[in-house]
Design a protein with these regions (language model features):
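Short, conserved "active-site rim" segments that organize catalytic pockets and cofactor/ligand binding
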Residues: 1-57, 66
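Peptidoglycan-targeting cell-wall enzymes and recognition modules
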Residues: 55-76
Length: 76
């Protein structure tokens, strides 16, 4: 595992009443030419945590900060 020195929290900027899944976000990122979902974890509206990108792979969630960070996004 890489040397993690920060956790970066994002929101999906989706409607709060819309059920959004890891696959929804993955599809959105792939449609924009990314290699996979950019976040390592996604927190659903009910508070459950779901894995996105593997922790063994550098995230794609915050330009200039991806190398040593974990990206977590919450739906909403």
């Amino acid at each position: 595992m890489k040397n993690i020195d920060k956790v970066i929290v994002h929101c999906t900027a989706t409607p709060e009443d819309r059920h959004t899944t890891v696959e929804d976000v993955r599809r959105w990122h792939l449609d924009r030419g990314w290699s996979d979902i950019g976040y390592h974890f996604l927190v659903y509206l009910d508070g459950t945590v779901h894995e996105g990108r593997s922790l063994d792979v550098q995230g794609a969630h915050c330009r200039g900060q991806n190398k040593n960070s974990i990206g977590i996004a919450y739906v909403g």
